[in-house]
């Protein structure tokens, strides 16, 4: 089971270079399992025992498995994750012609580590909006092959490179995508037009706009002398999306189960399809349109907010509290912060520990050092937006927000098992 889950994750990461592609990948799995797509623009007709999913902006998704009992009686079991990761996004007018090379101007999305982006074989993917035959359309594109690189400056020309050299995002991150002949001009939108034709057989009248991100073409892999680790891009947080989907599709029981995978977490979640927007609440209210039904059901519900945690790095162990250092392959981590950067409280943490113990899954705790700041997740945002009790958890990871992150190869199976137990749980605290 562990090897199969890990290979499934590797395949999912390869198919999901952007939030748009991740959402499409999730939707394909759901449809293959018998889930029916609901369109927010239409009237909905749902029924007990039904299987449904909803997307918004092509980059966020909510999957719904309705049980036989009403949510007014048993509530919802929700698992939340996010589809986005830090990356380099192409600017609207990106062409930069310098010294005979064509580069593309990029904007940093989220809190990316810059240095790992150098000397990588990069490709480009995302969503393109265009006009064809007088009609406005959008399609996902993925160049797949390596088309760009950000070469490092040789140390002979930068002797301070290993002494904490700061990287200027504006000047040093534009990737090189081609060499130009003297006097040659380049139009990036024409390249997109050609890609639409190759990938979709569409000839666009004009490419109007796009949301495109560079990504590393190196596939994720199981690594380590004893295959202890998984290395790959976008583990934060497609690892949790994949675990949530596997748990939902394979969970026993007949409860009301929800998987929420939203975009824009890395930039604050404040969008119409992010966790700080109305997406989840609007979907739940449409499932419970009568009077105070939503408010009553949500107070019987619980959210597991799943987002990667910082594992104790052997070279930097002093960055952790000595008593709260999560180990890779040590199981899911309960995240706790007294200042509500995480939404966990004693009741929700206790319930998650109980699930882990009953499932024979190891569990760990994470608290930041008292002299360091703490990141946050969709947990507090969703809790405050919807009013749902929440526990923040995640799998321990190294190199978070790098172009290539590292997680334990045993931990995915741990997380899928306990999330499956959560979905199947007949009683919530």
Swiss-Prot record:
Signal peptide segment: none
Gene3D superfamilies hit by this protein: Aminopeptidase i, Domain 2 (2.30.250.10), Zn peptidases (3.40.630.10)
GO cellular component: cytoplasm
SUPFAM superfamilies in the record: Aminopeptidase/glucanase lid domain (SSF101821), Zn-dependent exopeptidases (SSF53187)
Pfam families: Peptidase_M18
EC code: 3.4.11.-
Annotated binding of Zn(2+), by residue: 82, 156, 401
Cofactor: Zn(2+)
GO biological process: proteolysis
Protein keywords: Aminopeptidase, Hydrolase, Metal-binding, Metalloprotease, Protease, Zinc
A GO MF term: aminopeptidase activity
EC main group: hydrolase
UniProt family annotation: Belongs to the peptidase M18 family.
Protein name in the entry: Probable M18 family aminopeptidase 2
Source species of the chain: Pseudomonas aeruginosa (strain UCBPP-PA14)
Upper classification of the organism: Bacteria, Pseudomonadati, Pseudomonadota, Gammaproteobacteria, Pseudomonadales
């Amino acid at each position: 089971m562990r090897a199969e889950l890990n290979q499934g994750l590797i395949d999912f990461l390869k198919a999901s270079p952007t939030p748009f592609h991740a959402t499409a990948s999730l939707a394909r799995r759901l449809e293959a399992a018998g889930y029916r797509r609901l369109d927010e623009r239409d009237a909905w007709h749902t029924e007990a025992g039904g299987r449904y999913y909803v997307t918004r902006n092509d980059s966020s998704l909510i999957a719904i498995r309705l049980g036989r009992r009403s949510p007014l009686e048993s509530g919802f079991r929700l698992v939340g994750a996010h589809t986005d990761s830090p990356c380099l996004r192409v600017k609207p007018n990106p062409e930069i012609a310098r010294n005979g090379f064509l580069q593309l101007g990029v904007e940093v999305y989220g809190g990316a580590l810059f240095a790992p982006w150098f000397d990588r074989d990069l490709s480009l993917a995302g969503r393109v909006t265009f006009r064809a035959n007088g009609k406005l359309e959008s399609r996902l594109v993925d160049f797949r092959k390596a088309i760009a690189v950000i070469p490092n400056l040789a140390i002979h020309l930068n002797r301070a490179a290993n002494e904490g050299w700061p990287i200027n995002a504006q000047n040093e991150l534009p990737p090189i995508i081609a060499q130009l002949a003297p006097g040659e001009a380049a139009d990036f939108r024409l390249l997109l037009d050609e890609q639409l034709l190759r990938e979709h057989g569409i000839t666009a009248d004009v490419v109007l706009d796009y949301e495109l991100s560079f990504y590393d073409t190196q596939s994720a892999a199981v690594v380590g002398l004893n295959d202890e680790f998984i290395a790959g891009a976008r583990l934060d947080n497609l690892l949790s999306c994949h675990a949530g989907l596997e748990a939902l599709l394979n969970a026993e029981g007949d409860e009301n189960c929800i998987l929420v995978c939203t975009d824009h977490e890395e930039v604050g979640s404040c969008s119409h399809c992010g966790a700080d927007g109305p997406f989840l609440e609007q979907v739940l209210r449409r499932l419970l349109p009568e009077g105070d039904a939503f408010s009553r059901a949500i107070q019987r519900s619980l959210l597991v907010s799943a987002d990667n945690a910082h594992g104790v790095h052997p070279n930097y162990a002093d960055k952790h509290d000595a008593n709260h250092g999560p180990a890779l392959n040590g199981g899911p981590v309960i995240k706790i912060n007294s200042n509500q950067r995480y939404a966990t409280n004693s009741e929700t943490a206790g319930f998650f520990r109980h699930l882990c113990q009953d499932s024979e899954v190891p569990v760990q705790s994470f608290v930041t050092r008292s002299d360091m700041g703490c990141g946050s997740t969709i947990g507090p945002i969703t809790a405050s937006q919807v009013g749902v009790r929440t526990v923040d958890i995640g799998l321990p990871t190294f190199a978070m927000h790098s172009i290539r992150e590292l997680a334990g190869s045993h931990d995915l199976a741990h997380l899928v098992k306990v999330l499956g137990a959560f979905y199947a749980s007949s009683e919530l605290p």
